[in-house]
A protein has these predicted regions:
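Bacterial Sec-dependent N-terminal signal peptides
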Residues: 2-5, 16-44, 171, 210, ...
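An aromatic- and glycine-enriched ligand-binding surface/loop that stacks and positions planar moieties
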Residues: 23-100, 104, 184, 207, ...
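Flexible, polar/acidic helix-loop-strand segments at domain edges
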Residues: 100-111, 341-409
Length: 530
């Protein structure tokens, strides 16, 4: 398959205008009943609307990179799901810094953000816009609706599969909301369509809801690797459960490491395989070269899904200084994103000659950072590119073709190993070691980087997660799970806004509910200490 499925988001955007264009935050319902009634009468529209749900991770509005945005009150490119998620997951950590002084962007490094932060508000709005979109599709594909809309018997099973996928996408989005914000507004397809004030759900209760949803839809999803590229299958359900269980102690106070082993094992043995090249997973044709490893990816195309967010942001923003933008398949660098020396130190050889995951640009760059606003301070990261695996340019030098892996098999290898080391049962350290060394053999090209059982410990796993998964939206969650995101046990350059790094209060492990949401909904209470 090509990216044909996700291209349908262009068509879906036009149809979804009546369904969803009025949603700018949670209290505005994205439903126009008359439009819904007409669109859902024709089953030929259903797949295009489903594509719009998947496209919620990629596109930002109805007409392209700018104009008619889904989210108001912020630059449209900045409102991108992936861009917002990356900034909230990576900028407060050792993996990424950014040189721009746009609004409150530097507050992520300083870790002194407030409930009035525009970037946090935009991500909150994006999450609940996506949830509202999913809710409407789920409502319209219930059995009674399918019957009243006259959907033919031959199409019912397909409609139910589409519905299960929409429920998965809603669960994934709620997972991100739970991880970032903790206690959030809670709306499902069973809630009334008319205006009302949603109740707030606790983090632990939301965890239980997502878990129930995933287990309920598991058998309704396509088998692992049986769906089109860009669409979710059973392995995605298992992977999200494994991720939740690995972090369950943070979310609920109760560890679930045995369950993390169970579900990561399901993914690992499901038929997905590690891609042959690490570097190719982040290039313009990764949808072709790396689909054996990508459980689910946000699809991007330089012609059909243009946005200033997503991987367009990740490629352009990481190019600056003496770097040649053309070598990354783009027409310009935005001179923003780099990394800290603390992250660089995870690699014993930063040249990439041994561990090929060490993808740094050092020419003209200082290893240490004195001024965040100076691009040449801090090594640049060359992981993301709009060049293909064969060296050709992507289809557009402004908007990139590179897909963003929301879930990939390597994470499950790391999840299994960590859960075993944390005391989960049903796995073995021998198998865990094999899974870790499989990643390292790909990275090194041979067995020279393999570790022994004596070297396999929790500290190593955190470092290996950094080496394997950096700039893919995992680091904040990982550091929180290890108790290192706040406090003084681990500091990195500009943690807490200090060049040498400093301790940060524990309440920063979740973000505040935006002030605008609190004002709009009297049922919401602010997270503690905000």
């Amino acid at each position: 398959m090509t990216k044909k499925f996700i291209y349908q988001v262009v068509l879906a955007g036009a149809m979804a205008w009546g369904l969803a264009s009025c949603t700018k935050d949670l209290d505005r319902t994205p439903i126009t009943e008359a439009t819904s009634a007409s669109v859902y009468k024709d089953f030929a529209n259903y797949k295009a609307i489903l594509a719009k749900l998947y496209g919620g991770f990629s596109v930002t509005g109805q007409v392209g990179p700018t104009g008619s945005p889904d989210i108001s009150g912020i630059d449209e490119g900045t409102s991108s799901y992936i861009r917002g998620y990356f900034q909230m997951q990576e900028l407060p950590t050792d993996e990424a810094v950014i040189g721009w002084n746009d609004g409150t962007l530097q507050d992520f490094h300083q870790m002194d953000w407030t409930a009035d932060d525009n970037f946090i508000n935009a991500m909150f709005s994006r999450l609940f816009y996506q949830i509202a979109q999913c809710n409407e599709f789920i409502r319209q594909t219930a059995d009674d609706k399918l019957s009243s809309n006259g959907i033919a018997e031959k199409d019912l099973e397909t409609a139910r599969t589409f519905r299960a996928e929409a429920r998965f996408l809603r669960a994934l989005t709620y997972y991100h909301a739970m991880d970032l914000f903790g206690n959030v507004p809670f709306v499902t397809d069973s809630n009334q369509v008319a205006f009302y004030f949603p109740d707030q759900i606790s983090r632990a209760d939301l965890f239980a809801y997502i878990e129930r949803e995933l287990k309920d839809i598991e058998t309704q999803m396509a088998d692992a690797r049986a769906n089109e590229y860009g669409r979710a299958d059973k392995a995605c359900v298992w992977a999200l459960l494994a991720k939740m269980y690995l972090n369950a102690e943070v979310y609920t106070g109760t560890d679930r490491y045995t369950d993390a082993i169970t579900y990561s094992s399901k993914v690992i043995t499901s038929g997905y395989t590690l891609a042959g090249s690490y570097a190719n997973m982040f290039k313009a044709d990764n949808g072709s070269t790396s689909r054996s490893e990508f459980l689910l990816a946000a699809s991007f195309d330089g012609v059909r899904t243009q946005t200033y967010g997503g991987t367009t942001y990740l490629v352009h923003a990481a190019v600056g200084g003496s770097m040649n933008a053309a070598e990354f398949g783009v027409n310009s660098g935005w001179g923003g994103l780099r990394t800290t020396s603390a992250f660089v130190n995870l690699f014993s050889d930063i040249s990439g000659a041994t561990d090929k995951r060490a993808m740094f640009y050092t020419s003209g760059q200082n290893r240490e950072i004195a001024d965040l606003g100076t691009f040449t301070e801090g090594y640049a990261i060359t992981k993301w590119s709009n060049k293909t695996s064969g060296g050709a340019d992507g289809s557009n030098s402004t908007f990139v073709d590179t897909d963003y892996p929301l879930m990939r098999l390597a994470e499950m290898h790391l999840t299994y190993a960590e859960a075993v080391l944390r005391g989960g049962t049903g796995g073995s350290t021998t198998t865990a070691l094999d899974y870790i060394n499989a990643l390292r053999e790909r990275a090194y090209g041979n067995t020279s980087g393999n570790i022994t059982a004596a070297e396999l410990n929790l500290k190593f796993i955190l470092e290996e997660r950094g080496r394997e998964l950096y700039w893919e939206g995992h680091r904040r969650t990982d550091l929180i799970r290890y108790g290192l995101f706040t406090g003084s046990t681990y500091v990195w350059p500009f943690k807490g806004g200090v060049a040498a790094g400093t301790a940060v209060a524990d309440f920063r492990t979740i973000y505040p509910i935006p002030t605008s949401a609190l004002v709009a909904n009297p049922n919401l209470k602010q997270n503690e200490d905000y």
